[in-house]
Amino acid sequence: MAAPVNKAPRDANLWSLHEKMLAQPLKDNDVEVYNIIKKESNRQRVGLELIASENFASRAVLEALGSCLNNKYSEGYPGQRYYGGTEFIDELEVLCQKRALQVYGLDSQCWGVNVQPYSGSPANFAVYTALVEPHGRIMGLDLPDGGHLTHGFMTDKKKISATSIFFESMPYKVNPDTGYINYDQLEENARLFHPRLIIAGTSCYSRNLDYARLRKIADDNGAYLMADMAHVSGLVAAGVVPSPFEHCHVVSTTTHKTLRGCRAGMIFYRKGVRSVDPKTGRETRYNLESLINSAVFPGLQGGPHNHAIAGVAVALKQAMTPEFRAYQRQVVANCRALAEALMGLGYRVVTGGSDNHLILVDLRSKGTDGGRAEKVLEACSIACNKNTCPGDKSALRPSGLRLGTPALTSRGLLEEDFQKVAHFIHRGIELTLQIQDAVGVKATLKEFMEKLAGAEEHHRAVAALRAEVESFATLFPLPGLPGF
């Protein structure tokens, strides 16, 4: 028997405890973390989840995510790894790529996909790194108008997103009166700005994008067109909203929103023949594959998260089923039912409705704002988020609430259920107005929260609504792992 390296005999009891630690279930090994997870599980079970970017992953996805694939390091790409022992990791990644192309009906001769991005933000930054030189120019929908931080957000005084720090960003806007994207203004600004990349993507925009118009603007300016379909990727897979693939050079996405997978990202890119010279017949081919793959690894990331790639692969298989397509149709139907119910209760919904999974409710006509309403609704077990509305003067006091239907649709809610949800929201906003009247319209959010927490009459009203909400929510099963 070889002597221990440290010259001391191994403590058999200590080593036995080590082996026990490795085999213990979470509830025995770390009761603090276990209890936090249980509390969060209960919050999800008894509450109404209306955050548009959230969903409930299936048991199969979560099982893949918690598998032994977490243990394996595999820098590089299939067949070109920097580590040994990657035979099955290669098999998994190739399967995930194949399913990603299949779910969107893409020809592998014309499209490729990178499934290694850790999430949507790194995926977007990898595209910019690949296609836009440092300090090159990009155009994305402004964050206050429904865009995303990673599309180049900055204020008059500060560059907020890393995208705006390392690249020159000019946002495009919506029409403040209609809430629709102002494509004419975008076209004029692009002619003056000469972007290298135009981003067709949103985080709070309830209408379909005009990809054909965006592609024409890109072509007129020699720019690439990239779609960030993170919010609508599941809807695109089911064919219930227009696909960006017909018009875009590159498409990025997360995998955990409407696609209902785990948290990860994907980048699709065109390949093959880009154009043919009509005089000589000479072909020009896309070179996006090497640029994007190099930007992901080794440019911005190290080893891929193989457990997440497994979860994505499972979600992609589920997304090719008839039941998934039925689910996505119901997401849109539920969103329209929610919009109609709220408008019937006197609320203004930006753009007057929705083509997808979310709506933006403008509370200015009610005399309050999204921050206050969000806090009261949260106290009533309704989760949503404050959001700027077109024409808002300050992002610090946004006027709107963003509401989405994917998560609750996964729990089985239908149109009539969302009508009831709308009435819960209405009662929560009425409570918001009562508290605001008591504390004063000019009070800070902190003062508003102190009033919410300190006044007995408000406590009773919130508790009564919360009890009704939780009684209603628990009628619907929560997907996921048993025991959590």
Swiss-Prot record:
Cofactor(s) needed for function: pyridoxal 5'-phosphate
This protein's record includes keyword Cytoplasm: yes
Subcellular location: Cytoplasm
Residues recorded with modification N-acetylalanine: A2
GO CC terms of this entry: cytoplasm; cytosol; mitochondrion; nucleus
Group of enzyme by EC: transferase
Cited InterPro entries: PyrdxlP-dep_Trfase (IPR015424), PyrdxlP-dep_Trfase_major (IPR015421), PyrdxlP-dep_Trfase_small (IPR015422), Ser_HO-MeTrfase (IPR001085), Ser_HO-MeTrfase-like (IPR049943), Ser_HO-MeTrfase_PLP_BS (IPR019798), SHMT-like_dom (IPR039429)
EC number in record: 2.1.2.1
Alphabetically ordered keywords of this record: Acetylation, Cytoplasm, One-carbon metabolism, Pyridoxal phosphate, Transferase
Major location (coarse): cytoplasm
A single GO molecular function term of this UniProt record: pyridoxal phosphate binding
Catalytic activity: (6R)-5,10-methylene-5,6,7,8-tetrahydrofolate + glycine + H2O = (6S)-5,6,7,8-tetrahydrofolate + L-serine
GO terms for biological process, alphabetical: glycine biosynthetic process from serine; glycine metabolic process; L-serine metabolic process; protein homotetramerization; tetrahydrofolate interconversion; tetrahydrofolate metabolic process
Pathway: One-carbon metabolism; tetrahydrofolate interconversion
Membrane-crossing residue ranges in chain numbering: none
Entry-annotated residues carrying N6-(pyridoxal phosphate)lysine: K257
CDD domains in the record: SHMT
Family assignment from sequence similarity: Belongs to the SHMT family.
Misc. remarks from the entry: In eukaryotes there are two forms of the enzymes: a cytosolic one and a mitochondrial one.
Subunit structure: Homotetramer. Identified in complex with ABRAXAS2 and the other subunits of the BRISC complex, at least composed of ABRAXAS2, BRCC3/BRCC36, BABAM2 and BABAM1/NBA1.
NCBIfam families in alphabetical order: PRK00011.1
The protein's role, per its UniProt record: Interconversion of serine and glycine.
Protein name, as recorded: Serine hydroxymethyltransferase, cytosolic
Natural source organism: Bos taurus
